[in-house]
Amino acid sequence: MAATDNRKVVEGVHKMTPSEAFVETCVANGVSEMFGIMGSAFMDAMDIFAPAGIRLIPVVHEQGAAHMADGYARVSGRHGVVIGQNGPGISNCVTGIAAAYWAHSPVVIVTPETGTMGMGLGGFQEANQLPMFQEFTKYQGHVCNPKRMAEFTGRVFDRAMSEMGPTQLNIPRDYFYGEIECEIPKPMRVDRGHGGEASLQAAVELLKTAKFPVILAGGGVVMGDAVEEAKQLAERLGAPVATGYLRNDAFPAKHPLWAGPLGYQGSKAAMKLIAQADVVIALGSRMGPFGTLPQHGMDYWPKAAKIIQIEADHTNLGLVKKIAVGINGDAKAVAAELSRRLADVTLGCDATKAARADTIATEKAAWEKELDGWTHERDPYSLDMIEEAKGERTPTGGSYLHPRQVLRELEKAMPARVMVSTDIGNINSVANSYLRFDEPRSFFAPMSFGNCGYALPTIIGAKCAAPDRPAIAYAGDGAWGMSMMEIMTAVRHDIPVTAVVFHNRQWGAEKKNQVDFYNRRFVAGELESESFSDIAKAMGAEGIVVDHIEDVGPALQKAIDMQMKEGKTCVIEIMCTRELGDPFRRDALSKPVRMLDKYKDYV
């Protein structure tokens, strides 16, 4: 087949091998990249990836492959695909698929399995792979007969899109071989529409009388390409728009109605504004419990407000918060329909649009001023750590920097159209105060699963999907150690990215719990003194150490120039003090109580 025809899928019924049926169905669904590590279990199919126009990007560890598929899917809006060797290669993917599940990311994991004649005998690399993923997939397809290869392959791609989450295709390794006769199925995509008439009209009636409506824009706005429709609805209502926790790209920060993110270390402006709401439109948001916890000393969620929840997944309607109206529909279509119905209606909030606009601007300005002056943490432990750092010098002779000051400087230096992924951890989560975006599909985090090692592989996958956009990963030194080897993937396969490593020599998020609940009794929290810049250089990347605050912005700009102009990956190692932001979960811990005498001092 000529190179120009390799993406043309055969039509009608043909004789082919199951491997060919699998590959052709992948091509029919637009697959051009897969992530994984080569293996004998799928080698027959892998052999024809290249002539089909599919690039297999080899990784260092399969968890990284799953995260890369997640990042790829979240940027492109298409499937991200991960594949690996049966048994350990597949079990290594579980954490990455779990993170994709909580991000509602259309990742397809292809899991070749032990051959049918060896199942149940405890053979080499044998594992029961379907139970591994049953909690973290929307659909699991098991190829029970090679003649059904195309059918099941097509279905997992369809269901990943229609159900907005990962799906699994499990294939006994001997089922790639043989001769079958089949037709390659065409992709099926669901048109969700704008919801039911009764729920739409109920929402309109609530909005007619609302005095202070607020929109909470969630992941459904991003995944549904609904930002423009969200803007139109917000402008019609004069409503401030808060974004959901770790959904900072769901509304453009340059828009005057943008208020910032809710959740841990989110925007005080957004919290103060939503606290005034009498009607909240949760647009594509499940209003997750962690993302609406009290923050900055404010229990801000408006408990008396009427909530209109718009969700493509009906099982999320009213799941977390009591709602007045639930609309099961596409965020884009629902927002557009509400705007249409409200266009010529006099609303109770129309008369106060100008006053509310002033309130929004005032709250945002106050928050920005506070961030400018909030150069360091102010709790007693952090103040002790700041004092301690005054007598220390970094290995390169500089100073340890305040994380908040660093994050502000990074924010100022962000290039246009940037994509950012953040790992879990104390400094990375404080970054929620500072990260803002002007286009969707720009921000990626491990969401409710909260696993370490997420940021670097995810941004590599994102960069594969959008090579023309700057790509930056944020990680603390603890989380960085879990996936920094994927720098080799970026270097080997010419996928240039920039990583910022906050080197504060500790597992900060958990250590903060030991500060607040365990009287500073530190166990297993210290991480001493690797040179991540030197490690990056050993892996073939560039490395920069920053230990002067005035160098933060220029270092990022230099690394981005290397990425975009020279195709180079760079690790920026920023030396930070040991000060710590608030704990994630004050609600989840208690002061210790001891009953036995030998532990009586451990309170």
From Swiss-Prot:
Top-rank lineage group of the source organism: Bacteria
Metabolic or biological pathway, per its Swiss-Prot or TrEMBL entry: Organosulfur degradation; taurine degradation via aerobic pathway; acetyl phosphate and sulfite from taurine: step 2/2
Cofactor: Mg(2+); thiamine diphosphate
Example GO molecular function: acetolactate synthase activity
SUPFAM superfamilies linked to this entry: DHS-like NAD/FAD-binding domain, Thiamin diphosphate-binding fold (THDP-binding)
GO cellular component, one term: acetolactate synthase complex
EC numbers on record: 2.3.3.15
Gene Ontology process terms (BP): isoleucine biosynthetic process; L-valine biosynthetic process; taurine catabolic process
NCBIfam families per record: PRK07525.1, sulphoacet_xsc
Subunit structure: Homodimer or homotetramer.
The name this protein goes by in its record: Sulfoacetaldehyde acetyltransferase
Species this protein is from: Alcaligenes xylosoxydans xylosoxydans
Lineage summary: Bacteria, Pseudomonadati, Pseudomonadota, Betaproteobacteria, Burkholderiales
Gene: xsc
